[in-house]
Amino acid sequence: MCHARAARQATGEAEAAPRDNFSKAAGSKRVVGAAFETRAQRFLERAGLAPVARNVTVRGGEIDLVMRERDGTLVFVEVRARTSGRYGGAAASIGARKRMRLLHAAHLFWARMGGASACRFDVVAFEGGRLVWLRDAFRADETA
């Protein structure tokens, strides 16, 4: 599919707020998830990326954020949040099945955009109020 050259990992701080609960109620999860996506998008915009799309849904997959680097690279972003890293953390919660769904959705979106630009898959993870940006977190040609 598309690849961009590997880049370094960046971290930033995001303050935890008392209202940031991780309730299992479906509506509440959506609201909390949207808040974390907004935080991630703002962080990435401050880092120089431009927003392209948000919550792209296709049959069989969803992409939280689609951003564009200054060099034109299309960046598909998965946003994850966990209260702690106790069970491997937010980034570790993206298993092979989730990666396949992300890749499927990204491939369809990328093709719809003309398929000409390089792209990569990033993860913005929130763990206990700390934001971690994993650039080039995984690749389309990786297996489980």
UniProtKB/Swiss-Prot annotation:
Record InterPro entries: Restrct_endonuc-II-like (IPR011335), tRNA_endonuc-like_dom_sf (IPR011856), UPF0102_YraN-like (IPR003509)
Domain of life, source organism: Bacteria
Q: Which segments of the protein form a coiled coil according to its record?
A: none
Q: Name one Pfam family in it.
A: UPF0102
Which GO MF terms does the UniProt record name?
nucleic acid binding
Matching entries from Gene3D superfamilies are given as:
3.40.1350.10
Ranges for the region named Disordered are: 1-20
Q: State the family named in the UniProt similarity comment for this chain.
A: Belongs to the UPF0102 family.
Under which name does UniProt file this protein? Answer: UPF0102 protein BTH_I3148
Q: What is the lineage of its organism?
A: Bacteria, Pseudomonadati, Pseudomonadota, Betaproteobacteria, Burkholderiales
